[in-house]
């Protein structure tokens, strides 16, 4: 079924300029709707780890983008306090008490998750925003004013602190989604964008900004890398001096690496403050 679905989505994508709410076959509508429904249930996901490496399913990103071409904007009531006007309804618009109980997660007002995002059991959504295509795995906390961007992949037992921004990457299509692996802590007001991968058991301090062009400096080795935080890293904001010594530019600094056992035993403040 997935292969047939992928073929329809890929073929439709090649002719997307001709697509509109009034110019789409029933087959296309059903294929896109089914893909979004599978993302919403967590049966499919935009990226998954296969044999130790992350694989991005670009056709599912195409399905998300095509869904915007198939719908007109429409009024969406918001419990009497406001009204919205958009193409994508809330994930929870038609949820019953039984649906919430089966989902096993908490949604604190006024948290918003768009249809097509997946929220796993024991997740807590504080007043936050989770966009279409995102996958939030079990036991994760999305704290107040945090944003989980389109198609971002958040692992198990992750803590996204207040005001954290996890970037969404639907366009350009070839770009990969942001991935935060299991048991990571992302400090308040930090930003992770442009397909950066934060590997498991890492701690990102408050106010760290990570994009593909951000230099990641390993204090122990002196190595500078881009786009990936190695497993078990403790990262703080820093600066690197220019070669001519006239100025310095922002970077992220890996101050130490810890294993899962140490990460579990030692408090976050101690990890971040220790030399």
From Swiss-Prot:
Claim: Amino-acid biosynthesis is one of the keywords in the record: yes
A GO BP annotation: lysine biosynthetic process via diaminopimelate
Name of this chain's protein: 2,3,4,5-tetrahydropyridine-2,6-dicarboxylate N-succinyltransferase
Residues annotated as binding substrate: 106, 143
Any one Gene Ontology molecular-function term assigned to this protein's record: nucleotidyltransferase activity
NCBIfam families: dapD, PRK11830.1
Subunit details: Homotrimer.
The family this protein is said to belong to: Belongs to the transferase hexapeptide repeat family.
Positions of transmembrane segments: none
Keywords: Acyltransferase, Amino-acid biosynthesis, Cytoplasm, Diaminopimelate biosynthesis, Lysine biosynthesis, Repeat, Transferase
Domain of life: Bacteria
Pfam families (UniProt xref): Hexapep_2, THDPS_N_2
Gene: dapD
Reaction(s) the record says it catalyses: (S)-2,3,4,5-tetrahydrodipicolinate + succinyl-CoA + H2O = (S)-2-succinylamino-6-oxoheptanedioate + CoA
Subcellular location field: Cytoplasm
EC annotation from Swiss-Prot or TrEMBL: 2.3.1.117
């Amino acid at each position: 079924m997935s292969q047939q679905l992928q073929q329809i989505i890929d073929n439709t994508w090649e002719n997307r300029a001709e697509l509109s709410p009034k110019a789409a076959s029933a087959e296309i509508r059903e294929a896109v709707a089914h893909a979004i429904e599978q993302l919403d249930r967590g049966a499919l996901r935009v990226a998954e780890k296969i044999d130790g490496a992350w694989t991005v399913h670009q056709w599912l990103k195409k399905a998300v983008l095509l869904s915007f071409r198939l719908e007109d904007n429409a009024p969406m009531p918001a419990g009497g306090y406001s009204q919205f006007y958009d193409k994508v309804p809330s994930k929870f618009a038609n949820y019953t008490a039984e649906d919430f109980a089966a989902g096993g997660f908490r949604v604190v007002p006024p948290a918003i998750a768009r249809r097509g995002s997946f929220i796993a059991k024991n997740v807590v959504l504080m007043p936050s925003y989770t966009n279409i295509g995102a996958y939030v795995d079990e036991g994760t906390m999305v704290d107040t004013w945090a944003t989980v961007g389109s198609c971002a992949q958040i692992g198990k037992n992750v803590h996204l602190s207040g005001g954290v921004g996890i970037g969404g990457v639907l366009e350009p299509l070839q770009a990969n989604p942001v991935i935060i692996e299991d048991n990571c802590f992302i400090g308040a007001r930090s930003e992770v964008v442009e397909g950066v991968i934060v590997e498991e058991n890492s701690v990102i301090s408050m106010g760290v900004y990570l994009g593909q062009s951000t230099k990641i400096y390993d204090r122990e080795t002196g190595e500078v890398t881009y786009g990936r935080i190695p497993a078990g890293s403790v990262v703080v904001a820093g600066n690197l001096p220019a070669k001519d010594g006239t100025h310095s530019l922002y970077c992220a600094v890996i101050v130490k690496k810890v294993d899962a056992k140490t990460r579990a035993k030692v408090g976050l403040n101690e990890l971040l403050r220790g030399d």
